[in-house]
Swiss-Prot record:
Signal sequence, start to end: none
The organism's taxonomic lineage, starting at the top: Bacteria, Pseudomonadati, Pseudomonadota, Betaproteobacteria, Rhodocyclales
Requisite cofactors: Mg(2+)
InterPro entries recorded: Aa-tRNA-synt_II, aa-tRNA-synth_II, aa-tRNA-synth_II/BPL/LPL, Lys-tRNA-ligase_II, Lys-tRNA-ligase_II_N, Lys-tRNA-synth_II_C, NA-bd_OB-fold, NA-bd_OB_tRNA
Name under which the protein is recorded: Lysine--tRNA ligase
Cystines in this chain: none
Pfam family name, one: tRNA_anti-codon
Binding positions (Mg(2+) 2): E418
A molecular function (GO) term: ATP binding
Protein family membership: Belongs to the class-II aminoacyl-tRNA synthetase family.
EC number(s) recorded for this UniProt protein: 6.1.1.6
Subcellular location: Cytoplasm
Sequence positions that bind Mg(2+) 1: E411, E418
Xref: HAMAP family: Lys_tRNA_synth_class2
Length: 500
């Protein structure tokens, strides 16, 4: 295929790739391509931790032999001796390669290796004149030939779309990206440990549901050929987890993916990770305390601190989290709004429109929630539990004993974003059936996010669900918070993208 229409940069890249393929062909012919018999015993970061402060004389007096491997990121060839810097997950280390140290034939080959190649090296540690910890190579081998050139080391990946599409390249080039996903892994592990240490059992529930449920969202639809039935990728695991509590598994949790056929935004990806947990004989108040402790623990494990900077602004998780009702939150940021005005549905509708939002159908509680989302939610920088949600927008939550119009429900907001949603579970099967019926009628009227009627879940409740509290925590949004990431795509390894 002709390259005459390619840009100069593309032509240069194609030329580099062709040269590297030719080198690979020569190594194949020599029987040295892609060996798999080099064992690494040391990592760059650990060597720096143990020997980085050693005096040069100490390393010379007691030679330390090491076996390292990694990707070549820098290379300086200087006649009979050269320096290269290799990178592994833990960091970087410099290698000193001499013709007299590795042999004339190996050194001749080495001079043709490229940035991006993966090498293995055996040698001893020493310090250069500038004090840099370095491996003096006695053996060095090409383990993997890189056929494509890496981006310019000074600019890295400047195309954000390319970062997300080619995450493998982003991970090679960006220390911040590597930090983000290592921190994510540590955070998820700390959450698992926290749950297990508090007596919870980790479980797995179906990803394909005959009836979508557990959240107000539009599902992805698929088809099972053998059973000839329509199935839905799960939007939430809630109803299955509560079935397990009915069965006697009194403290359960699951960390897994949910799928919602909705829009893309800096806070939304169609495929995302949630941690949901349910505890018998707990209510929403005890769950708020538990969630507060869990999030602090996650911060300590990921960052080593409970106080940090997010997007240039200080955030302190060590202080007690605030607790406000929807009306209290609105009035905190708009003290001119009176309680009487907020109890007037027509007045609330006018205010929703005044903030530039469309009014969705609903009663007073739904309207107050819409106004809160329009004028107060984004202001909740410090960790804040918004409590006592209206029944009409909480079809799975238990109604308050003191006010049947509201539920024992909370949502946790940090930096103006919802991080968690929890409530005392509705365990009255007749009340739940009536709410499912109302949701089904709303769906028939055109509400795509209204829930389906789940007869099997009602049957499970009829066997008896003990008083139970449940909560879902958005893992991706929590990682965004703890890694100072502005977009959810920065914390998902392979986010959903439009076709190239």
């Amino acid at each position: 295929m002709s390259d005459h229409n390619a840009t100069p940069a593309a032509q240069d890249e194609n030329h580099i790739i062709a040269e590297r393929r030719e080198k690979l062909a020569q190594w194949r012919q020599a029987g040295r391509a892609f060996p798999n018999d080099f064992s690494r015993e040391n990592t760059a970061g650990k060597l720096d931790e143990v020997y980085g402060d050693k005096e040069p004389e100490a390393l010379e007096a007691s030679p330390v032999e090491v076996r390292v491997a990694g990707r070549v990121m820098l290379k300086r060839v200087m006649g009979k001796a050269s320096f290269i810097t290799i990178q592994d997950l833990s960091g970087r280390i410099q290698l000193y390669v001499q013709r007299d140290g590795v042999g004339e034939d190996v050194y001749a080959d080495f001079k043709h290796w490229d940035i991006g190649d993966i090498v293995g090296c055996v040698g001893t540690l020493f310090k250069t004149k500038t004090g840099e910890l370095t491996v003096k190579a006695s053996e060095i081998r090409l383990l993997t030939k890189s056929l494509r050139p890496l981006p310019d080391k000074f600019h890295g990946l400047t195309d954000v779309e390319q970062k997300y599409r080619q995450r493998y390249l982003d991970l090679i080039m960006s220390e911040q990206t590597r930090f983000t996903f290592v921190a994510r892994s540590r955070m998820v592990q700390s959450i698992r440990n926290y749950m297990i240490n508090h007596g919870f059992l980790e479980v797995e529930t179906p990803m394909m549901h005959p009836i979508p449920g557990g959240a107000a969202a539009k599902p992805f639809v698929t088809h099972h050929n053998a059973l000839d039935m329509e199935l839905f990728l799960r939007i939430a695991p809630e109803l299955y987890l509560k079935r397990l509590v009915v069965g006697g598994l009194e403290k359960v949790f699951e960390v897994n993916r949910n799928f919602r056929n909705e829009g893309l935004s800096p806070r939304h990806n169609p495929e995302f990770t949630m941690m949901e947990f349910y505890e018998a004989y707990a209510d929403y108040r005890s769950l708020m305390n538990f969630t507060e402790g869990l999030i602090r623990q996650a911060a300590r494990e990921a960052l080593g601190a409970e106080s940090f900077v997010y997007q240039g602004r200080e955030l302190d998780l060590s202080k007690p989290f605030h607790r406000l009702t929807i009306v209290q939150a609105i009035r905190k940021y708009h003290p001119g709004f009176s309680e009487a005005q907020l109890a007037d549905a027509e007045w609330v509708k006018e205010k929703i429109q005044a903030f530039g939002e469309k009014v969705k159908p609903g009663g007073l509680g739904s309207l107050q929630l819409q106004l809160f989302e329009a004028c107060a939610e984004a202001e909740l920088w410090e960790p804040t539990f918004i409590i006592d949600y209206p029944v009409e927008v909480s079809p799975l939550a238990r109604a308050s004993d003191s006010n049947p119009e509201i539920t024992e429900r909370f949502e946790l907001f940090i930096v103006g974003r919802e991080i968690a949603n929890g409530f005392s579970e509705l365990n009255d099967p007749e009340d739940q059936a009536a709410r499912f019926l109302a949701q089904a009628q709303a769906k028939e009227a055109g509400d795509e996010e209204a829930m389906y009627y789940d007869a099997d879940y009602i049957r499970a409740l009829e066997f008896g669900l003990p008083p139970t509290g449940g909560c879902g925590i958005g893992i991706d949004r929590l990682v965004m918070l703890l890694t100072d990431s502005a977009s959810i795509r920065d914390v998902i390894l392979f986010p959903q993208m439009r076709p190239e």
